[in-house]
Amino acid sequence: MNIVITCAGKSNRFKKEGINIPKFLLPLGESTVISNILDTYDDNDNFHLVITNKQLDQNPNLKSYLNDLKKNIYLNIIKDHNLGPTYSAIQAKTCESKKDIIISYCDFLIDWDYKKFK
């Protein structure tokens, strides 16, 4: 399965409250939001994360952190934009398959039975 996760948002509301890291990097339990999202899927899935060059500039260790989360992480680095998560998902050029794709946001968690879904 190919999992496209759009992480390219600007987190404007969080920044207004003084939180200056991307939402997907916020701590959640003993980990981060993105780590918890990835854990809802199978380790053998392909994870296509879409992030911006601006996020990389502001978080120098971001690339290595994301690559260390799972073995099949594919980063799609795009320019900062205001076009929304659908635009970001379309930019996941590492996802060449036209089938078996799940598109997920990076800032919500769901409790579901992924094995039943597959």
Question: Each PLM stretch: what is its role?
Answer:
Residues 8:
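The conserved beta1-alpha1 loop
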Residues 19-24:
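Short alpha-helical oligomerization interface
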Residues 113-118:
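Conserved donor-nucleotide/metal-binding helix-loop-beta segment in metal-dependent transferases, i.e.
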